[in-house]
Every structure is written in structure tokens, then in C-alpha cells.
């Protein structure tokens, strides 16, 4: 990717939601909500405190994260639809993604 976010910003690629419910009902595109889950594809260096000291970001490329429905700014970079958001817009990191898929 030819983009490097500045300060405490990250670039997130949305992860599409399931197209079927647990009961097997197919959800049409018009009824789907925007996914609030994504994968970090780029990370800025971090913010600065009042003394000018760098505060590194606690996220890394490849992390799967949860964020608010209206978080970030939608952009198109290299033909891909991505979100640019501040680290503070991210609610948390999903850990152990592989175990969740095995249980389903």
C-alpha cells in the first residue's frame, strides 16, 4: 500500500459480515449493516504527549479490531475501500480468531 498514516491514526480494512443468520436465513444487501470489525493494514507512529514524547500505538498490522459503526473516514486507496481512524476510535482487539472459527 502506498499510504502511511500520521500521528495516532490507523488504516482499517472492513471484514464483511456473515451473509446468513444462524438459522440459515440469507440477509439481502439492503438489510446489512456496515461491519464494525476490521483488520489493521497500516499504523502511524503514534501521538505525542504534552512534553513532545512519542506515545507508540498499541496496535500492529494484522490485528483484528472492533470499532464503532460511525468511526473513521472512508477512503479508497489503491482501489480498495478502507477506513482511516484514530487509535481511540477502536474499542478493542479480537484475540484467538482461529479458535472462534473452529467452534462454529
Curated annotation (Swiss-Prot):
Task of the protein: Together with the chaperonin GroEL, plays an essential role in assisting protein folding. The GroEL-GroES system forms a nano-cage that allows encapsulation of the non-native substrate proteins and provides a physical environment optimized to promote and accelerate protein folding. GroES binds to the apical surface of the GroEL ring, thereby capping the opening of the GroEL channel.
A single GO molecular function term of this UniProt record: ATP binding
GO annotation, cellular component aspect: cytoplasm
Keyword Cytoplasm set for record: yes
Compartment annotation: Cytoplasm
A Pfam short name: Cpn10
Subunit comment: Heptamer of 7 subunits arranged in a ring. Interacts with the chaperonin GroEL.
Signal peptide span: none
Entry-linked NCBIfam families: PRK00364.1-2, PRK00364.1-5, PRK00364.2-2, PRK00364.2-4, PRK00364.2-5
GO annotation, biological process: chaperone cofactor-dependent protein refolding
Protein's recorded name: Co-chaperonin GroES 2
Keyword Cytoplasm attributed: yes
Native source organism of the sequence: Rhodopseudomonas palustris (strain ATCC BAA-98 / CGA009)
Annotated transmembrane regions: none
UniProt xrefs under HAMAP family: CH10
Family per record: Belongs to the GroES chaperonin family.
Alphabetic keyword roster: Chaperone, Cytoplasm
Stored PANTHER family: 10 KDA HEAT SHOCK PROTEIN, CO-CHAPERONIN GROES
